[in-house]
């Protein structure tokens, strides 16, 4: 899941109230979230904030202009109040805090990674479009995703016979396998016989010969540093494409088309420069305070043909059955494609774009 998010100039929305629902399967405390479509006319863009509402989640504006600061403040507030520390460790790569309040929250380096109230929105959007489009996916590779939540969604497909999950931080995988509350949330995904875990750098894993995959899911951290920017080069995307079957595809989390359009569209542009066909989409994630974007890519045009008209099976709990709305963008967001850049090993610039768009 993305590690960094925008220090936003617009109002950020935070989840402040939760109601338990015995019917939900979202997490161990059984919360229910129903995402409703939000329409906001362009001529009123400057007059009103997007409102995200659901039966069980109340979203209210906060005066914070810095989401990273808000994450750190919210973590301190939780730790000062009544809560349960489920897991706390300084690994070789990051500070990990998994806490339980009314929900379960994961913080990495004091930045919110997910809330159990709405993490399913992000993970269903990441996984289900590509898994439903690729015909009978049998072999899946997940790069990142050590919490097991994307893995949980992949394992819902009975056609899947083999999954390789690669994560740099072994502590993340240990937490996802051993903390009961997270095991409940990820549905014991790491104990499925189809799953093979690899604690190593993704580029190291991709440097070795391997069998091909029908689906590859890329859940890297955002390109906040020059090192992380190397995970989003045209060369690496081209390398990843060589691991795809003829009818295979990969999906990449790509930040927010609303808050970080240069980063979002530059990732898509970089994938295209690697010689792939790309389809772009997004969905609203309330705990992120914005919508979040993804790019699906394939070696052949026909693989992604008419994906917008696809009905997702198994039916997600937070996505529309028909994917068409996810592939629709506001005109002002689409216009930002004209400024998209190419990120390559010889010209690493994505982290600079990221830092510029994160500035207040």
UniProtKB/Swiss-Prot annotation:
Homodimer or homotetramer. It catalyses: S-adenosyl 3-(methylsulfanyl)propylamine + putrescine = S-methyl-5'-thioadenosine + spermidine + H(+). Spermidine binds at residues 123, 147. This is Polyamine aminopropyltransferase 2. CDD domains: AdoMet_MTases. The active site is at residue 219. It is found in: Cytoplasm. It comes from the Bacteria. Pathway: Amine and polyamine biosynthesis; spermidine biosynthesis; spermidine from putrescine: step 1/1. Keywords: Cytoplasm, Polyamine biosynthesis, Spermidine biosynthesis, Transferase. It comes from Bacillus anthracis. The gene is speE2. S-methyl-5'-thioadenosine binds at residues 94, 167, 201-202. Its main location: cytoplasm. InterPro entries: PABS (IPR030374), PABS_CS (IPR030373), SAM-dependent_MTases_sf (IPR029063), Spermi_synthase (IPR001045). NCBIfam families: PRK01581.1 (NF002435). One of its GO terms (cellular component) is cytoplasm. Pfam families: Spermine_synth (PF01564). Belongs to the spermidine/spermine synthase family. GO terms for molecular function: spermidine synthase activity; thermospermine synthase activity. HAMAP family: Spermidine_synth. GO terms for biological process: spermidine biosynthetic process.
